[in-house]
Amino acid sequence: MKVLIAGGGTGGHINPGLAIAKYIKQKEAEADITFVGTKKGLETKLVPREGYPLETITVRGFKRKLSLDTLIAIKELIQSFFQASRLLKRIKPDVVIGTGGYVCGPVLYMAAKKGIPTLIHESNAFPGVTNRLLERYVSYVAISFKDAEKYFKNKKKLVLTGNPVREELLNSGRDKVASNLGIVEGKPLIVAMGGSRGARRINETIADMLNNYFKGEFNLIFATGEAQFDDISSTVKIDEKYRDMVKVVPYIYNVDQVYVASDLMICRAGAITISELQVMGIPSILIPSPYVTANHQEHNARSLERDGGAVVILENELNADLLYKQICSLIFNKDVLKKMSKNTSKNRVTDSAEKIYHLIKEII
């Protein structure tokens, strides 16, 4: 079976594709899987690391406001359909899967027009524009939240699968990996990250907290995002006796190990992040991005908060004092953390990749 997976831009679009690819390989070792993205997305790093070939086309989003940049983006979009057509002709996939990002538009559309079985996966409760446009052309739409149903017209194409997460998250043990991370024993581990691209407000707040409040109460792995790493890491000034407890990194590649060892997460509220927290049962302080369509991250965050698995801090309310006090109020109360962990896990889905695999086999 030849499989082409289109997805890119952020980890939230790429990691579900990697999870699907890994499951396919487990079921069919001889499966030939290729990814397609753009040259500017995180896929250029994540996909090769997992051993899959990556093809690229040129496409990006654009605003409706007329400008030179918009005209260039429209030109690239038109060209991307021809690039996608040539790619499909060369690879000859048996099925094409879209997991999000602008690259899905031309690739999935051209595949459907060529009669190739197609499937898109929508990770959010509020679907993106590209997936809503593709609905009429593809064979199936795999959705992760029941709330997403109302945004699609053809209900017969919808299948509730949940978000596929990496198998490593399901099969790891804390004791086995904690020592590999070099964390100080006897102290809880906090993991803070603002998504694959980083989040300026979160980064600056955590740097402020480390400089002015932190007294070695916990271990911290702080992922800034590659674009902001040099700037943020240079501002962090930690007392020498606490330096072994803090690791400032641009990106967490071994995130499965970090998840397993963590006691509390500080992060955005993207759909894939929420699903991974649920699978792992990790309590969290969620800071939803205010810069996303229809404010869908706050909806995600409030859902987990209602379940009792998370504390939500809006970005416009975020400051170092508030964050520090919230962290301490949780990590020094093990009963609260234990209850939050249980509440986080109660709506977890662990067989999403399997469900998507069965859809693939149905349409080819």
Swiss-Prot record:
Ordered alphabetically, the record's keywords are: Cell cycle, Cell division, Cell membrane, Cell shape, Cell wall biogenesis/degradation, Glycosyltransferase, Membrane, Peptidoglycan synthesis, Transferase
Major subcellular site: membrane
The compartments listed are: Cell membrane
Quick one: a GO biological-process term for this protein? Answer: regulation of cell shape
User: Do you know which Pfam families this protein is assigned to?
Assistant: Glyco_tran_28_C, Glyco_transf_28
**Pathway(s) this gene product operates in, as recorded in its UniProt entry:** Cell wall biogenesis; peptidoglycan biosynthesis
Q: How does it sit in the membrane?
A: Peripheral membrane protein
Q: Which GO terms describe its molecular function?
A: UDP-N-acetyl-D-glucosamine:N-acetylmuramoyl-L-alanyl-D-glutamyl-meso-2,6-diaminopimelyl-D-alanyl-D-alanine-diphosphoundecaprenol 4-beta-N-acetylglucosaminlytransferase activity; undecaprenyldiphospho-muramoylpentapeptide beta-N-acetylglucosaminyltransferase activity
The entry's protein name is UDP-N-acetylglucosamine--N-acetylmuramyl-(pentapeptide) pyrophosphoryl-undecaprenol N-acetylglucosamine transferase
Give the gene name. Answer: murG
